[in-house]
Amino acid sequence: MARAAVGARKLGGRMAGLSFDLIALQLFAGLALGAIYVLFAIGLSLIFGMLTVVNFAHGAFYMVGAYVGLYLISLGGNFWLCLVAVPLLVGLFGLAVERVLIRPLYGRGIDYPLLLTFGLSYVMVECVRISFGKTGYPFDTPEVLQGAVDIGVGYFPLYRLFVIGATAVVLLALWLFLEKTSFGLIIRAGARDPQIVRVLGVDVSRVWLIVFGIGTAIAGFAGLLAAPLQGVIPEMGGTILAEAFVVTVVGGMGSIGGAVLAGLLVGVVVSMTSLFAPEMAKVSIFALMAIVLIIRPQGFFGRAGLMS
């Protein structure tokens, strides 16, 4: 009880010393962090929603995206070129992984692809360590995106605003693709009932291939965007993977809309907790997940019994 009282007094003291502007800036920082979570989680949800594959290698694709960007820049490329090249290259790698490793495991239950991608993630991380070393590298923010901009409540890093904007563009493009194209219609129908899609004469294996490629491409893009914020290290994918699984569980397994809402919510919760109680920042993610699962076990937009 005494410790709880001391903790409450410390928290009250911190809150008393905070201005509205500082809280608002921290909220924007949470949105920028949440944007990275969103990009990572929508790829994870897209793959699970269509393929029913829990891709434990998703964090490794995220990490590869950061390293590919770093390598391209070392060859004389620039960040703007990387924004296009990285998702393309990582997506092509994802296509190869699906075609060669994952496709033979379809129809064998959820466990086999899970174990395979779990092992694949370790292989990918070790390959990066052998190729680039165990230590990390800084990733310079593009010169045009350095500095801060006045957003009314204070100055906010321009690059973080760019991350929020880039995420919004990707979400819009993905929505247009899924809602306004015939292939997007097939993907949405296949996520609900693959058998119906097969009856219509659609090559489901080709659809799964493209979906896996898109999901991994988005993960690589997220890794590239995160690189200037946190640097590039082989373990960066494992860190976000645990947090992103919380996002997908809270949002609902396989739900892209849920991943967007939950990603932003988790980012804001982590950011605000870091302001008021820094030692509880990481714990707050799992506390949020526990609360959501108690109230709604399938998450915000998940379907009951999806994992059965």
Predicted regions and their residues:
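Cytosolic-side transmembrane-helix boundaries in multi-pass membrane proteins
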Residues: 2-14, 22, 100, 131, ...
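Transmembrane helix-bundle core of multi-pass membrane transporters
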Residues: 104-180, 204-207, 272, 277, ...
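Membrane-interfacial amphipathic/re-entrant helices at transmembrane-helix boundaries
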Residues: 1-39, 68, 79-82, 108-113, ...
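Inter-helical junctions in multi-pass inner-membrane proteins, predominant
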Residues: 18-36, 156, 177-182, 208-248, ...
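Alpha-helical transmembrane segments within multi-pass membrane transporters and channels
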Residues: 77-121, 127, 261-266, 296-297
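Helix-loop-helix "hairpin" substructures at the membrane interface of multi-pass membrane proteins
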Residues: 33, 154-232, 256-262
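Short, non-helical or kinked segments that cap or interrupt transmembrane helices
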Residues: 35, 44-66, 107-112, 183-186, ...
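Membrane-embedded helix boundary and interhelical linker motif in transport proteins
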Residues: 28, 50-96, 100, 272
